[in-house]
């Protein structure tokens, strides 16, 4: 059994995941009635979601209680990159929507859903999540609360004994080991997720609402393959594409099928460790990115809102488009704190144009129809950019120190 496991782990993870994708797609088309296969995907996603809050909590405490002051500069750089990238996503979505205007067929109202009524409500939700009970935050995977309490505990424990710090560090290492075991079975999880998608939706979702999907996905691909390389080059001053493709293979592919930035946090941390990045930095920036680095969500909110405006014949001038970009970026940063994510923040952006809640809910309904593709690509972009920008900021510091950048 041990020999079989060693042979399995000897094959590179991307190759194993690719094999799982192919087998899952074939099984989904050949035997779609074998619904039991999809449980592999559910087990994988739930295992990652289960371990991620504990991993983040103890890694952040371990990192901060032993951290040196020099790490603050890197973290500030990463946060600036996150916020700029999210705003850039909204701007690109505005340009794409202007070049390829979309209208929607809104035949019937979507099911009534509770959505935020204004930016104040989004900010209030974020602030309340910060001070939520730490045990509740871990149980509910409230990463804003987890980060806030972990930072407080980590700073408070800087004066603790070396033995206490060692115990915390050992516990964090044990959690990281468990994550490694889970990730080794990612191909089976991806197999189940792909099977579920293909057997349930087939290829139909790629043909309906094709123009809308093309603008959404096209904008996200433009961000990943055009603007991201520019940002990375600014940081590392060398060819950015090896790092771009590494993050694509190791982070985006998994996030595409799990459709969960939270579930992808352990995977991103694993890749950071492989690249030799500073754990004191990435243990903070990766979970933080899952909350505020939301360029994919900004694209979705902007494109869907402008599609609603076009459908109703509402003209959108340049100043309004700029305001929409900022509003979408701010809303996107709150997407992780709202059940339903970016789609349920569409009414907030629609309010800028005086679009009624009924119409906004119909737009959300369209979003749920294309969600199997839109949400997958959005999550892949969001989560892989957490890894990409965290690495780029770290490599920027290495470049300044004259260290060789290898990944």
Regions from the PLM with identified roles:
Residues 8-10, 14, 18-30, 42-48, ...:
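Signature of multi-pass transmembrane helix bundles
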Residues 303-407:
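Transmembrane alpha-helical segments and their short flanking loops
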């Amino acid at each position: 059994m041990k020999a079989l496991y060693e042979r399995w782990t000897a094959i590179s993870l991307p190759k194993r995941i690719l094999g799982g994708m192919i087998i899952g797609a074939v099984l989904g088309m050949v035997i779609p009635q074998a619904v039991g296969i999809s449980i592999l995907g559910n087990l994988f996603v739930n295992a990652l979601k289960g371990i991620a809050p504990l991993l983040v909590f103890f890694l952040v405490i371990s990192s901060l209680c032993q951290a040196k002051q020099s790490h603050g500069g890197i973290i500030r750089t990463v946060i600036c990159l996150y916020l700029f990238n999210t705003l850039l996503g909204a701007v690109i979505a505005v340009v794409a929507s202007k070049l390829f205007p979309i209208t929607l067929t809104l035949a019937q109202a979507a099911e009534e859903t509770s959505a935020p009524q204004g930016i104040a409500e989004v900010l209030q939700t974020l602030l309340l999540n910060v001070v939520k009970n730490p045990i509740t935050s871990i149980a509910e995977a409230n990463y804003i609360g987890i980060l806030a309490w972990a930072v407080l505990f980590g700073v408070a424990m800087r004066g603790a004994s070396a033995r206490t710090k060692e115990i915390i560090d050992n516990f964090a290492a044990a959690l990281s080991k468990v994550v490694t075991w889970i990730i080794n079975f990612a191909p089976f999880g991806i197999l189940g997720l792909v099977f579920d998608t293909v057997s349930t939706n087939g290829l139909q979702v790629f043909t309906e609402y094709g123009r809308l999907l093309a603008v959404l996905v096209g904008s996200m691909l433009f961000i990943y393959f055009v603007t991201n390389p520019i940002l990375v080059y600014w940081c590392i001053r060398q060819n950015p594409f090896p790092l771009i493709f590494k993050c694509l293979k190791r982070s985006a592919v998994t996030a595409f099928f799990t459709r969960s930035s939270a579930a992808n946090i352990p995977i991103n941390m694993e890749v950071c460790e492989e690249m030799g990045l500073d754990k004191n930095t990435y243990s903070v920036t990766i979970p933080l990115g899952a909350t505020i680095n939301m360029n994919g969500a900004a694209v979705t909110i902007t494109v869907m809102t402008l599609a609603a405006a076009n459908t109703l014949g509402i003209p959108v001038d340049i100043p309004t488009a700029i305001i929409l970009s900022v509003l979408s970026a701010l809303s996107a940063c709150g997407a992780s704190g709202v059940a339903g994510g970016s789609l349920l923040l569409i009414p907030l952006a629609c309010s800028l144009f005086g679009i009624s809640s009924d119409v906004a809910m119909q737009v959300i309904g369209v979003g749920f129809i294309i969600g199997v593709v839109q949400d997958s690509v959005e999550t892949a972009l969001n989560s892989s950019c957490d890894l990409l920008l965290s690495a780029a900021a770290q490599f920027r510091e290495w470049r300044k120190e004259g260290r060789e950048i290898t990944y």
